[in-house]
């Protein structure tokens, strides 16, 4: 049995003072930010050898809580420089939006278990499972369950390979498992959220107005990534020459994406929902050589080679019987300044059916001299419709991938 607990606390104070004799004329700012994190973990482990059988197991639970608080004030017109930013009450005005406070509270509870069975120290089967419950997802899907299983075969210990001297290790391994992700969710993403939008007079009294900035989605849940892998590890000459190879395929489902929705029936014009999917596949090879191995000196040479393919499968689907669609072609990165004919400088796009983040560009054949002696770009009409359109249409082509 093992236990672990920790508490982390961080606090930051910021202050700014602009003297009355500079352009800002007595503007002051004061802010305080605090972050607290609690973590507790309890684990139980078991290990038993019975003849040719070996069983090991572990179970653990963990709880993590994170709170963030912030408060800041911006004010104008301090009467004397002697106060600095230590007497905000002496300022003449606090403009709208100059006083803010925020609070964020999120928690995560996890239960994990794993068991491994080994026969003859040759065949090994491992089963793992974890359940994660987060305060950040919807009330209908607080918990996510993520199992995995893997198998390893130590072939070198088989009789038909035992006498092959140069071969010191040969293992085959494969696995299938799931993992969860909440990267696109903040503490209150699943709730209706309002924010101040301005000040209006009501009965001669200034009143702050509020506006909706987020729809609630009680069905929001974990993104799920399912991964399959198969590989081999080979060692030669007492493992001074090592070779590893692995193929993997993963698919992320229930991807989080913000969709445009009608108002009404929704209170706000976008909704975060779990609909999209994406895949990754690849092959990795590793080579390790130890040409020198002496008591006082050792030389290791490592080389790696990998191939990876990514594909955005879909961004459209249904939410409670309502069709949710996203554009098949969406600009996500641009260049500033001159450089493209027409001033449309979007260059990086997400395109359904393509890797996530591709260069989607017009094709320039060169420069054309105009009648007045100036030059302009000669942009190719890729869709052959008689005109060049540099919007996200047919006169662009996929020129490469933005991510390595």
Where are these regions (language model features)?
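Extracellular/periplasmic, surface-exposed regions of secreted and cell-surface proteins
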Residues: 1-4, 8-9, 17-18, 23-338
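Short, 15-30-residue, compositionally biased linear elements
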Residues: 33, 371-374
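Glycine-centered small-residue hotspots that permit tight backbone geometry or close packing
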Residues: 229-231, 353, 366, 386
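Hydrophobic beta-strand positions
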Residues: 247, 367-368, 379-380
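C-terminal beta-signal and terminal closure region of outer-membrane beta-barrel proteins
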Residues: 275-280, 327-365, 369-372
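Acidic, glycine-anchored loop motifs typical of Ca2+
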Residues: 373-375, 380-400
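C-terminal substrate/ligand-recognition segments
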Residues: 404
């Amino acid at each position: 049995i093992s236990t672990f607990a920790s508490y982390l606390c961080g606090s930051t104070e910021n202050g700014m003072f602009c003297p009355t004799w500079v352009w800002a004329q007595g503007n002051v700012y004061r802010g305080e930010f605090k972050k607290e994190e609690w973590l507790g973990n309890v684990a139980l482990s078991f290990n038993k050898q019975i003849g040719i059988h070996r069983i090991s197991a572990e179970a653990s639970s963990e709880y993590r809580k994170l709170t963030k608080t912030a408060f800041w004030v911006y004010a104008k017109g301090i009467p004397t420089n002697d106060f600095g930013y230590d007497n905000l009450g002496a300022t003449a005005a606090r403009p709208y939006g100059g006083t803010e406070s925020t609070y964020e509270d999120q928690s995560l509870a996890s239960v994990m278990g794993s068991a491994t069975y080994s026969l003859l120290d040759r065949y090994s089967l491992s089963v793992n499972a974890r359940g994660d419950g987060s305060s950040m997802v919807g009330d209908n899907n607080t918990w996510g369950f993520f199992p995995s299983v893997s198998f390893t075969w130590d072939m070198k210990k088989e009789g038909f390979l035992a006498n092959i001297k140069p071969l010191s290790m040969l293992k085959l391994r494969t696995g299938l498992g799931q993992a969860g992700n909440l990267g696109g969710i903040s503490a209150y993403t699943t709730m209706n959220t309002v924010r101040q939008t301005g000040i209006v007079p009501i009965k001669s009294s200034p009143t702050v107005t509020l506006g909706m900035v987020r729809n609630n989605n009680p069905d929001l849940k974990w993104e799920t990534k399912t991964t399959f892998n198969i590989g081999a590890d080979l060692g030669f000459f007492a493992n001074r020459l090592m070779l590893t190879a692995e193929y993997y395929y993963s698919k992320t489902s229930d991807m989080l994406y913000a969709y445009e929705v009608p108002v009404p029936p929704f209170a706000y014009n976008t909704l975060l929902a779990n609909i999209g999917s994406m895949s990754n596949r690849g092959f990795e090879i590793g080579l390790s050589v130890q040409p020198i191995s002496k008591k006082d000196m050792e030389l290791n040479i490592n080389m790696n080679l990998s191939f990876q393919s990514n594909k955005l499968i879909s961004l459209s689907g249904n939410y409670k019987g309502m069709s949710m669609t996203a554009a098949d072609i969406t600009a996500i990165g641009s260049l500033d300044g001159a450089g493209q004919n027409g001033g449309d400088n979007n260059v990086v796009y997400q395109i359904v059916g393509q890797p996530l983040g591709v260069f989607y560009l017009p094709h320039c054949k060169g420069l054309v001299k105009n009648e007045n002696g100036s030059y302009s770009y000669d942009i190719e009409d890729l869709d052959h419709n008689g005109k060049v359109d540099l919007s996200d249409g047919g006169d662009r082509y996929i020129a490469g991938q933005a991510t390595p």
